[in-house]
């Protein structure tokens, strides 16, 4: 005797198996000009062979997945996307082809729904073997995975810190202005250009503005060293 509940359950299960929502994936390649990537789904699918046995198989490569870089108001945070990076692919409920090609509000180029052809790649999700260490519990950081270089904003002290094991370069077409009660530089300073100051300059205990010189005599000779 046929059970309509069982039949409905089987039909619903078959429909659900084709419904794509989200899946972890591994970046295969990245097109930085189109801002899209190819992704290998990291969860295998299942098929039955001719004997009825279930086998795990790789799902098809997801191509032309738009990559999300956090952005808004004319500013964007970008980062390198490399082969092997892990990501989460979320699938649109409707076909994205027309929107992706032309932007704006578009008609559907195809009536497919929750399809593997309409994935967006979100980077940053990690499996346990690829987690990064030393996550700060007090500050927001822009950092390298190894932690050797970072810029952070501390939420409690409001301090901004920058650390790197390499070089640091600041370049500006306009002026650079620093305002603080005291600026401390630990290290030698080399200036390729003129130095103007509205206040005094001291070398050790010797003032540039008020120091006296020793061994002064009238005439065209050379005075002695400055007097502290």
Model-predicted segments: where are they?
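Hydrophobic packing positions characteristic
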Residues: 1-172
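Residue-level signal for pocket-adjacent positions within structured domains
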Residues: 60-62, 196, 220
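Short, low-complexity, Pro/Ser/Thr/Gly-rich segments in the mature regions of secreted, periplasmic
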Residues: 221-227
């Amino acid at each position: 005797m046929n059970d309509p509940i069982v039949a409905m359950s089987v039909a619903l299960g078959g429909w659900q198996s084709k419904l794509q929502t989200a899946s972890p994936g591994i970046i295969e390649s990245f097109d930085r000009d189109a801002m899209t990537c190819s992704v290998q789904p990291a969860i295998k699918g299942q098929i039955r062979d001719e004997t009825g046995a279930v086998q795990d198989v790789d799902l098809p490569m997801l191509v032309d997945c738009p990559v999300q870089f956090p952005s808004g108001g004319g500013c964007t945070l970008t980062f390198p996307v490399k082969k092997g990076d892990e990501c989460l692919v979320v699938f649109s409920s409707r076909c994205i082809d027309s929107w992706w090609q032309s932007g704006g509000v578009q008609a559907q180029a195809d009536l497919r729904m929750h399809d593997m052809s309409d994935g967006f790649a979100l980077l940053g999700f990690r499996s346990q073997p690829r987690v990064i260490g030393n996550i700060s519990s007090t500050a927001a950081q822009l950092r390298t995975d190894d932690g050797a270089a970072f810029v952070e904003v501390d939420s409690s002290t409001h301090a901004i810190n920058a650390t790197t094991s390499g070089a640091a370069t600041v370049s500006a077409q306009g002026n650079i202005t620093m305002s603080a009660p005291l600026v401390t530089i630990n290290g030698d300073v080399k200036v390729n250009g003129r130095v103007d100051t509205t206040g005094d300059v001291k070398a050790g205990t010797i003032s540039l503005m008020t120091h006296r010189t020793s061994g002064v005599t009238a005439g065209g000779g050379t005075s002695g060293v400055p007097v502290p």
